[in-house]
């Protein structure tokens, strides 16, 4: 069956979902090459390179604004997961069908250049509170599914949702050098 073409400048979640659905490694590699972008490479490096050490606390991302507290409680991770669940239930996660309201104000394609702030050796002088605040601000601006990806990557758990291996990534992008980053 033919592979769906994604729109120009697709969201990261659209690329990863499409690649993850492929049964063969060859198809996965082909699509990773087709939708190659520095932002996707950076996320894969953070996720799969053991020498990249996250400076963010592992697990749930704690956050609630005053407005949010009146509506619900819980962490930002919980809120992202609730939005993702609602979108999946309403089938609004299919390629390009997410409503504009839920799309967010920015994308990982735009924000990836800030990721160095969250890893060891990137911006070590940044105070923990400032780093965590910056991370939360980025998450709040992203489409919920891209925010979920960023939360998975910070804990090196991308494979839990997207069945794309380090080997798939290494084959698609042989110029990535693994190790020696921290």
Where do the model's predicted regions map?
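N-terminal nucleic-acid-engaging modules of covalent nucleotidyltransferase systems
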Residues: 1-182
């Amino acid at each position: 069956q033919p592979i769906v073409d994604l729109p120009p400048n697709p969201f990261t979640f659209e690329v990863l979902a499409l690649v993850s659905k492929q049964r063969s490694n060859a198809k996965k590699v082909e699509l990773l090459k087709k939708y190659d972008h520095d932002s996707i490479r950076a996320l894969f490096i953070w996720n799969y390179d053991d020498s990249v050490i996250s400076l963010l606390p592992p697990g749930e991302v704690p956050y609630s604004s005053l407005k949010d507290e009146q509506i619900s409680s819980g962490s930002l991770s919980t809120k992202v997961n609730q939005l993702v669940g609602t979108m999946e239930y309403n089938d609004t996660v299919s390629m390009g069908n997410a409503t504009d309201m839920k799309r967010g104000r920015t994308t990982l394609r735009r924000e990836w250049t800030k990721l160095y702030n969250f890893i060891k050796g990137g911006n070590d002088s940044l105070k923990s509170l400032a780093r965590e605040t910056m991370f939360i601000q980025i998450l709040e601006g992203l489409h919920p599914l891209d925010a979920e990806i960023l939360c998975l990557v910070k804990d090196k758990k991308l494979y839990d949702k997207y069945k794309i291996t380090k080997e798939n990534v290494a084959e698609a992008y042989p110029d990535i050098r693994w190790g020696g980053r921290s």
